[in-house]
């Protein structure tokens, strides 16, 4: 089997376990804290550093870092190490200062970006002052992970996010009785440290030991910095958009922020297992082809990526849509998280799932442009997405409540993907629309037997809340659905589902 296919499958496996741990974390958090005001404030505040990491670490920074690092690595190992050390040094100084400022001015920051006042503002500011420490840990971790990915080491670094969920779960079990909601805060910091430690140790093993290096005037670093600053604007817009969504949710009934946050976690399951796994493996290869000027292979990767996203996300989003009530009934409801909270979460999740395919394709198109060192086009599309998302959310929230926020995202991603498609065509990339539509048709055909399986299992007597009977039913339905899906792909002539990178593109 092709080594890139193997790498993708390994990343999918580790990401799957990471998401399962995330579900366990959400289940335990919801069981102990429910959808009350404290849980709302924690979820709202944690969403801020969790989003900031997209521009200060995992999103913008790694997208700017990896192409430059690949370029230096092709020159020599010494140049790659020098560039790596310079970026780490810059990270510690710059992001360390940002975190310090956030801690000092936690209260005015929370006053400005939230609707919380009085005691709720004091509580939110206190939680924020601790949680921002996570940004520094994850920003350093993301650089180490990028280095490992560049050397085709995917499995171990993709396993490290499990540590965050593990830290939160362990901390709640140990400290809930004494510290209440702050037990989750302790867990974020502890889990973030473990998440940093794993890729750090692996980088040491391949000869990337850090020591302070201040080559800030080197051309390669200035190129990285310029590209990163440009990308920050694009990622910042999407982050501000999501933060506005959470702010709008906080104006609705108590529990809305927690419901929205939980829906996002379950929505991110297929994103993490499939899209992020594919992008983790394919992006370094895209960057390599772009550096070498091999546009034919680069374009082949783009086209094959589109096909595999269609083949995966159409049936997966459909399965999650029809089974969402049963999944959340099993894994989320219980303790302080009521039937009403679970039903509301399922409703929001379904609205998110309508745009899952477009979300993944939007991110994939962004990766393509980052690989060719074009940060402007993704920025303009991010601006368009934000304008659409905010406008639809503000208009729709009075009519559709919390569901409007998820629908706004789905509609906005769909429009932006269509615009992205025509921009890519103008760049001269050849995309056979008939071939893509043929793959789309095959994916849609698989939905009929999948719904038949759902119709069969729906007739069973399901319990309310968690039970092993529900678990067995859901596992059986999942196994049968996956088996039937692969049979369908085989019958339809798609025998190599994960071979999205053609041999001629490698």
Swiss-Prot record:
The chain crosses the membrane at residues 4-24, 86-106, 127-147, 153-173, 181-201, 232-252, 263-283, 308-328, 345-365, 377-397, 405-425, 436-456, 474-494. Keywords: Cell inner membrane, Cell membrane, Cell shape, Cell wall biogenesis/degradation, Membrane, Peptidoglycan synthesis, Transmembrane, Transmembrane helix, Transport. The keyword Plastid does not apply. CDD domains: MATE_MurJ_like (cd13123). Coiled coil: none annotated. GO terms for cellular component: plasma membrane. Signal peptide: none annotated. Pathway: Cell wall biogenesis; peptidoglycan biosynthesis. One of its GO terms (biological process) is cell wall organization. Belongs to the MurJ/MviN family. Involved in peptidoglycan biosynthesis. Transports lipid-linked peptidoglycan precursors from the inner to the outer leaflet of the cytoplasmic membrane. This is Probable lipid II flippase MurJ. The gene is murJ.
